[in-house]
Amino acid sequence: MLLYILLIESRFIMKIKDNFMLIKNARIENNERLSLKAKRRLEKSKADNTLKAYACDWSDFSDWCQYHGVTDLPASPETIVNYINDLADDAKANTVSRRVTAISENHIAAGFSGRHNPAKDGMVRAAMSAIRREKGTFQRGKSPILMETLYLLADLFDEEKLSGLRDKALIYLGFAGAFRRSELVHIQYEDLTFTPQGVIIFMAHSKGDQLGHGEQIAIPYAPQAEICAVRALKKWLDTAQIHRGPIFRPITRVQSLRNTQLSDKSVALIVKKYVGLAGLDEHLFAGHSLRRGFATSAAQHDIDALTIMRQTRHKSEKMVHRYIEQGNIFKDNALNRMYNK
């Protein structure tokens, strides 16, 4: 298994070096009027997670091209159409669309823009339209951890152990702050301000704040102590004696605390562990279940979209309205009115 991982990683690095131009943008590198410092800064215009996603997407396309004996850079429109039609046999429409975006962005970085960009060709757009019509674009997503789920989990944490205290703080804070898992593990002790009303968390960067303006998220004390994120967080920090650095960290089997940051994948594993202990199907849940659960629960409590967005930090109402529709799927059901007649 280790050898396989190393081979995959070495292949990934080779692909980036050979033809993933978003790391080393040709238009930037070949511009003699730009200073080296300016070039390096321009190369950071896209978020790291975006670049990683594009790199994986491009690697898949490049492998497909190599297998079929066709050129990936520059690719022909026909090559892209053939690729996405093969991809659509198993992948969702949204995945196919993201791959086309990655192919397009990489061609732009290599200097193929406008009408010279094969991913913008009318043939590719027509193929994508057909795939969307055939497969649809609805994303099911993971099940939400709702407010009532928090009560269900409350007695499952072993608070005699550091891991139990950490896991409780992580889950309840993740829900209360509607955090993405990457945001949750990046929170530093220095980002916290405790007040008589609760805690304010400063986020320097997030998916919705790519320019780094910074955002503040307020988490008030909950009247119900058993589901209070602020109390759980304070107990965890006090017991673990964390006074600087990442607030969520790995813990060894002998309950020894490490100084490094918890990985975002660990958030999903922790969530799955406790929903499984509660008798729920762990395969239906993931790290995003906390963020989705907050939005869905808020909708069920008739909280308006703008108020929900202040906590979730969504920049568009589209996704929030989708959560509201899902949260009220039974409340606004026509059958309920018929049954009550």
Curated annotation (Swiss-Prot):
<keyword id="KW-1160">Virus entry into host cell</keyword>
<dbReference type="InterPro" id="IPR011010">
    <property type="entry name" value="DNA_brk_join_enz"/>
</dbReference>
<feature type="active site">
    <location>
        <position position="314"/>
    </location>
</feature>
<keyword id="KW-0233">DNA recombination</keyword>
<feature type="active site">
    <location>
        <position position="291"/>
    </location>
</feature>
<dbReference type="GO" id="GO:0046718">
    <property type="term" value="P:symbiont entry into host cell"/>
</dbReference>
<dbReference type="InterPro" id="IPR052925">
    <property type="entry name" value="Phage_Integrase-like_Recomb"/>
</dbReference>
<feature type="active site">
    <location>
        <position position="180"/>
    </location>
</feature>
<dbReference type="GO" id="GO:0003677">
    <property type="term" value="F:DNA binding"/>
</dbReference>
<dbReference type="GO" id="GO:0044826">
    <property type="term" value="P:viral genome integration into host DNA"/>
</dbReference>
<dbReference type="GO" id="GO:0075713">
    <property type="term" value="P:establishment of integrated proviral latency"/>
</dbReference>
<dbReference type="InterPro" id="IPR002104">
    <property type="entry name" value="Integrase_catalytic"/>
</dbReference>
<feature type="active site" description="O-(3'-phospho-DNA)-tyrosine intermediate">
    <location>
        <position position="323"/>
    </location>
</feature>
<keyword id="KW-0229">DNA integration</keyword>
<keyword id="KW-0238">DNA-binding</keyword>
<feature type="active site">
    <location>
        <position position="288"/>
    </location>
</feature>
<dbReference type="InterPro" id="IPR044068">
    <property type="entry name" value="CB"/>
</dbReference>
<feature type="domain" description="Core-binding (CB)">
    <location>
        <begin position="21"/>
        <end position="111"/>
    </location>
</feature>
<dbReference type="InterPro" id="IPR013762">
    <property type="entry name" value="Integrase-like_cat_sf"/>
</dbReference>
<feature type="domain" description="Tyr recombinase">
    <location>
        <begin position="140"/>
        <end position="336"/>
    </location>
</feature>
<keyword id="KW-1179">Viral genome integration</keyword>
<dbReference type="Pfam" id="PF00589">
    <property type="entry name" value="Phage_integrase"/>
</dbReference>
<dbReference type="GO" id="GO:0015074">
    <property type="term" value="P:DNA integration"/>
</dbReference>
<protein>
    <recommendedName>
        <fullName>Integrase/recombinase xerD homolog</fullName>
    </recommendedName>
</protein>
<feature type="active site">
    <location>
        <position position="207"/>
    </location>
</feature>
<dbReference type="GO" id="GO:0006310">
    <property type="term" value="P:DNA recombination"/>
</dbReference>
<comment type="similarity">
    <text>Belongs to the 'phage' integrase family.</text>
</comment>
<dbReference type="InterPro" id="IPR010998">
    <property type="entry name" value="Integrase_recombinase_N"/>
</dbReference>
